[in-house]
Amino acid sequence: MLRYYLKLGVLSIRANWALSGLMVAAIAIGIGACMTIVTVRHVMADNPIEHKNDQLFHVQLDNWNPNDPYEEPNEPPEQVTYLDSTALLEAGRAHRQVISFKSDRVVQPEGDGVLPFQQEVRSTSADFFAMFDVPFKYGSGWDADADRAEERVTVLSASMNEQLFGAEDSTGRTLMMNNEQFRVVGVLDQWHPVPTFYDLNNNPFDGPEEIYTPFSLAVTGEWGSSGNNSCWKPPEEGGYEGYLASECIWIQMWVELTDEANKEAYAQFLDDYVMEQKELGRFPRELNNRLSTPADWMVNREVVDETVSVLLALAVLFLVVCLLNTIGLLLAKVIRRGNDISLRRALGASKSELFKQYIVEAGMIGVTGGLAGIAMTWLGLRGIENVFADYDFISYLVTMDWEMVGLAVLLAIVSALGAALYPTWQACRVSPASTLRIQ
């Protein structure tokens, strides 16, 4: 019977191509507007490390002003001090631990006529690549011994390697930054976590850094942080050493804990550590340590802007308006086909058969509207990309994956079927006797 209903649906759409076209257009425009915003929000709220979400934790310690919290109502600082990050790293109580910050350096490419350029560099401890499942194309990262020895090694992204060395295996070659030599030990494969969950400061949609160096080397070289730096009181001593010994927060810390028992043990370790520091005159506030999963941390830092949520609500309302128009068009179509419906009822067609026929026809219109809606969504995303072309990160936010394509088609079908329920019910209520008597 499905083939028969599909055939009747095709004939009905052809016989009323204008009304059918308007319904497809209404659904496509509504789906396009809605899915454009849904896609942007989907990318913004994506968790690039979801498969390890229950194992990775962002560390927060509340070393802030005793009189005022870092953020209301009682949020601890989003970063940690050099003193605490290095002490916790050295303790090694987690399966893996990462401390890192970003810094601006001047890259000096090989060859005459190639101008130096400024580049943001991620200075991090050795576990960064293993903890965050960073893929390598050539070589590997450095180890903890290289961290302790402050070896001048570096890892390049695939795009930076192509820019500097023509995409060949550059392991063992030399990179010059700020007149200092670094030996390339690894080149990443394609890796673009968006948002950059491991550091949500500044703009989390700029994408990951292109160059990575050991944390200890950056500190010894007195590299400044190009990320957020916050202090609740000035350093007691001047210079870089005074900055390292201060209560200023500028380092992101993550730990990998394999199960709930390890998480509880590490949380207790943090409490014990802070209590020890209190005896030394630090941490004037009450215990307020936090361990947040990547998903929880992104919610905490409000990665999805409130404006996007408002736009999503407006887009859904616009889709509802389009569906109301579709309902009106379907009702008009039912009224125009009243004689045909009455004749079929008089010849023995049951209400259930009519219902199935019109639902199948509505589904066909929904599929067509969904496919057209995908095209409208693509146009909407390209429009956003063109309007905000000056922002380098915008290309990451306007990417439509297969999940969104499937959602668009499913939403179109469900919307069309939902819009068809009332007109179909009205069609089934048509009295064949009264209609044919009038004719």
Which functions belong to the PLM regions below?
Residues 2-14, 84, 88:
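A short amphipathic helical element positioned immediately N-terminal to and/or at the very start
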Residues 3-4, 274-314, 336, 381-406:
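Membrane-helix entry/capping segments
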Residues 324, 331, 339-385, 406-407, ...:
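Transmembrane alpha-helical interface segments in multi-pass membrane proteins
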